[in-house]
């Protein structure tokens, strides 16, 4: 899959911007190609992502209106949900934020188990505003399972596995790719999870 064109993101992490719950936000910040305009999280408003992730100057704001008009920064065009609430469900408190983002013309990118495109209110608002909803958990129409096809000669595949989520499988794969490219080898990262797809899909 060819990477999408770079976007200008505001990342929603309300109440969860930290190493345990914001793996999507942190992964996109550390490895993504998109410009990140702001972190939308009222619990850390006024602070900066570089307190947690040195070298990443991204202000945290309390409201979407603030994120849309930060002096010296471009207007975002996409709201990306950067944390996974318990069960991967959409918190009711976020509904207004998402609807406001749609009305402001922002695309929505989500890895939640709740598919935003199947929510009647959110889907109708997006259709009326002419904006896209991208549910990264939505399975493609045709998904090929294991077919026993062998790899091409000379190709090496490194599979990273773990016994839990958010323990670094994707980060290891991305660091291996970075090291391989630095050594002059050809290497690609094939994402299978939502965060990886947001970074490289």
Regions found by a protein language model. Give the residues of each.
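Glycine/threonine-rich flexible loop motifs
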Residues: 86-93
């Amino acid at each position: 899959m060819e990477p999408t064109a770079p976007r200008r993101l505001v990342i929603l992490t309300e109440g969860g911007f930290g190493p345990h719950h914001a793996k999507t936000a942190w992964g996109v910040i550390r490895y993504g190609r998109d410009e990140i305009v702001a972190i939308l999280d009222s619990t850390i408003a006024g602070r900066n992502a570089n307190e947690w992730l040195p070298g990443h100057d991204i202000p945290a704001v309390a409201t979407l209106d603030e994120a849309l008009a930060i002096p010296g920064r471009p207007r975002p065009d996409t709201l990306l949900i950067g944390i996974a609430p318990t069960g991967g469900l959409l918190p009711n408190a976020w509904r207004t934020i998402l609807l406001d983002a749609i009305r402001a013309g922002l695309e929505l990118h989500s890895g939640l188990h709740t598919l935003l495109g199947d929510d009647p209110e959110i889907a109708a608002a997006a259709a009326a505003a002419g904006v896209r909803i991208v549910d990264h958990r939505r399975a493609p129409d045709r998904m090929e399972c294991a077919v026993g096809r062998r790899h091409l000669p000379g190709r090496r595949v490194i599979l990273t596995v773990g016994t839990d989520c958010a323990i670094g499988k994707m980060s290891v794969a991305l660091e291996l790719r970075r090291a391989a490219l630095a050594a002059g080898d050809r290497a690609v990262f094939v994402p299978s999870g939502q965060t990886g797809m947001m970074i490289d899909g």
